[in-house]
């Protein structure tokens, strides 16, 4: 095994997982929308998955530090395969009522939270072993995420059209199992607790959670990022879970076009992510972050709200995708370089949980906007909200600290 084997294995495992996740992101909303005809119920299902995901991602941070992120990730991926497979299995037996669906997707979300956090927490160690910078590894991870999302979105459109939305979820279940095997084989010996730093016997679980918060709240740039990304994630969740599927259904574009649209977004963002991986270290972080967010956000919503032709929707999506590819490499480097190794699991999990904290409301908000205003006004409102949010870094001074190297920090003592 070479020093780059863990990096390659982690990227492959994550890519496979993202393919399955993208399939479920399209298949589940389409399944609910097709069987119930309700945008509100579609939003509720999205909220039922995201809410426990956020909660368990936040609460699982100390577990990652105590047990090790690799072990947590492997267990969560293995169990997730069977939970996701339960949806089409129960549907085939005629046992998948709406309340049962809510419970199953909630369990899936609860497992995905710490599982995803574990993958992220292994990033700095994998980068160190491979001899790569955080910007480069974050850029490669973003490129894999975007390209896998592109393939998964296209695959989702084909699967839903051919075998149905419920049966398409078997692909997501299989992706968890394959990811489990690849990650387990390629990262042997990595992802263990930091010895001598995190003493599980000396502090309680609650104190370790408090340590994570005590550190995070003293980093103004991380708090600013969390607040902004929480709002943009809220709007994006409304888009992917409700607004885009309803637009595709009401415009007559259909699920195939919806899948292609997501695939184009993912594919074009790969270009941006690869550029960021290659030259990200030389780009000014703050300026790149602001410009990329302005381009990838509001225009997507406005072009759909104006009932533009499909070629215009796809053209804007391509440009937005390229811009979005620059975001995760910047965010990943800024966040990870500021967190001490002994606190990495709990702080990174809490950071991500805050960024995702409003997402459970995204689907519900999207459903309410469509029900109250109609799809075009709902898209326009979402686009304006996105524009206002992406202008925030120009008015909040702490964002400019992105371009500064972090000072050496000592672990924050536990509070009582």
What residue ranges belong to the model's regions?
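Hydrophobic alpha-helical transmembrane segments
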Residues: 98-109, 133-195, 259, 263, ...
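Substrate-agnostic recognition of the 12-TM MFS/MFS-like secondary transporter fold
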Residues: 9-25, 49-64, 68-80, 100-160, ...
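Membrane-interface helix-capping segments at transmembrane helix termini in multi-pass transporters
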Residues: 33-43, 86-110, 129-133, 159-170, ...
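Juxtamembrane intracellular "pre-TM" segments in multi-pass secondary transporters
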Residues: 1-8, 189-227, 410-416
